């Protein structure tokens, strides 16, 4: 989960990372009020989860409250690379002597953590890495030893930060490591990490990506979720503990097991080439259990997608036998009632498949078509979706 800058700075404050004073607002009047409270020049900064805000006019220096108000009016509602600005961070402007770069992230290739540091901050780090790779130090971090002050200082030295700020930078780097580890982050990045004229070190910007798989041990992270930006279907699926990803096609997919669902996406995409180019509408893995409740929740999500024209239920019975799956489908259709209004193509295989097919045949629901093989089912689902377009 990517955080807004103001949310990243909330985590920074929690771990005593030095940064500039400020607050977030979603109104022009609020921006003026914050600027008046600070009583000094401020930066009015668009809160969007995308880079290039400054070049797009989303970051403005404001000498006083009047300027902050005018800049807030200009920035709120601005479209920055497809992201509409709905919130602003109004923060005290800082005197900057130099700009640096620091980040912690996962090094998936070497299966460890990585620190990156550079004396050249304030620009896109990809540019630095491409044009002047020697200026970007990459330092592996031992997952057991972590980052103490001495190691944090060595990171700053590797990044060629000036000697007179190494101690102050080390303190900040060590605290950023605490954010990275204690908050279960996948990325903590500060660009720029600035040196003020009196040799203070401040994190003027912040980018944090949290590991959503660690949410169970980070209950406070739920407050960071941007529900306004989350697709409502994905939000509904998450509330029901369903593994769901919305795609842009017309054939809804339900399966048990990620591998089977991925294979189903492939066969539907292939079948769709013969039926007007229809494509899978989603990834939805209901896991090992296919109770009536789980199936109903899955169908409820998919059937509420206006793009979906047909649904392909592809289940291989293992620990959960096919008769239980079939009962789940029948129960789900009863639960949904009139909301179940799109054709379902069901393919069952595996444990107790004959009984599962018998249950579906006996129920004789007018929207359900039972098909023997995955290829045949994909073809039928694609055909029905194309006919309904």
UniProtKB/Swiss-Prot annotation:
PROSITE patterns: ATP_GRASP (PS50975), SUCCINYL_COA_LIG_3 (PS01217). This is Succinate--CoA ligase [ADP-forming] subunit beta. Residues 9-236 form the ATP-grasp domain. One of its GO terms (cellular component) is cytosol. Its cofactor is Mg(2+). It is an enzyme of class 6 (ligase). HAMAP family: Succ_CoA_beta. Its EC number is 6.2.1.5. It comes from Rhodococcus jostii (strain RHA1). Mg(2+) binds at residues 191, 205. Succinyl-CoA synthetase functions in the citric acid cycle (TCA), coupling the hydrolysis of succinyl-CoA to the synthesis of either ATP or GTP and thus represents the only step of substrate-level phosphorylation in the TCA. The beta subunit provides nucleotide specificity of the enzyme and binds the substrate succinate, while the binding sites for coenzyme A and phosphate are found in the alpha subunit. GO terms for molecular function: ATP binding; magnesium ion binding; succinate-CoA ligase (ADP-forming) activity; succinate-CoA ligase (GDP-forming) activity. Heterotetramer of two alpha and two beta subunits. The keyword DNA-binding does not apply. The gene is sucC. It catalyses: succinate + ATP + CoA = succinyl-CoA + ADP + phosphate; GTP + succinate + CoA = succinyl-CoA + GDP + phosphate.
């Amino acid at each position: 989960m990517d955080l807004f800058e103001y949310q990243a700075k909330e985590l920074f404050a929690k771990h005593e990372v030095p940064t500039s004073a400020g607050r977030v607002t979603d109104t022009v009047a609020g921006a003026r009020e914050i600027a008046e409270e600070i009583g000094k020049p401020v930066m009015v900064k668009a809160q969007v989860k995308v880079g290039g805000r400054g070049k797009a006019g989303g970051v403005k220096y404001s000498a006083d409250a009047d300027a902050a108000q005018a800049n807030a009016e200009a920035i709120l509602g601005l479209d920055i690379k497809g992201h509409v600005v709905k919130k602003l961070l109004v923060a005290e402007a800082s005197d900057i002597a130099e700009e640096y770069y620091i980040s912690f992230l996962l090094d998936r290739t070497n299966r460890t953590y990585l620190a990156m540091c550079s004396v050249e901050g304030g620009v896109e780090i990809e540019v630095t890495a491409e044009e002047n790779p020697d200026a970007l130090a990459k330092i592996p971090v031992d997952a057991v030893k972590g980052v103490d002050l001495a190691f944090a200082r060595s990171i700053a030295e590797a990044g060629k930060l000036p000697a007179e700020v190494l101690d102050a930078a080390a303190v900040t780097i060590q605290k950023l490591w605490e954010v990275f580890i204690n908050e279960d982050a996948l990325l903590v990045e500060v660009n720029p990490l600035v040196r003020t004229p009196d040799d203070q070190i401040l994190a003027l910007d912040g980018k944090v990506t949290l590991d959503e798989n660690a949410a169970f041990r980070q209950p406070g992270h739920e407050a960071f979720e941007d529900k306004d930006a989350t697709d409502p279907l994905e939000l509904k699926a998450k509330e029901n503990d369903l593994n769901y990803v919305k795609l842009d096609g017309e054939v809804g997919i339900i399966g048990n097991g990620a591998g089977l669902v991925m294979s189903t996406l492939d066969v539907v995409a292939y079948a769709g080439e013969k039926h007007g180019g229809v494509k899978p509408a989603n990834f939805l893995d209901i896991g090992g259990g296919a109770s009536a409740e789980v199936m109903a929740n899955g169908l409820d999500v998919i059937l509420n997608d206006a793009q979906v024209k047909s649904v392909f239920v592809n289940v291989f019975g293992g620990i959960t036998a096919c008769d239980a799956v079939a009962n789940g489908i029948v129960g789900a259709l009863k639960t949904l009632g009139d909301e179940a209004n799109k054709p379902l193509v069901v393919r069952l295989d595996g444990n107790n498949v004959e009984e599962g097919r018998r249950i579906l045949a006996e129920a004789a629901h007018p929207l359900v078509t039972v098909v023997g093989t995955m290829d045949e089912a994909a073809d039928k689902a694609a055909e029905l979706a194309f006919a309904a377009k």
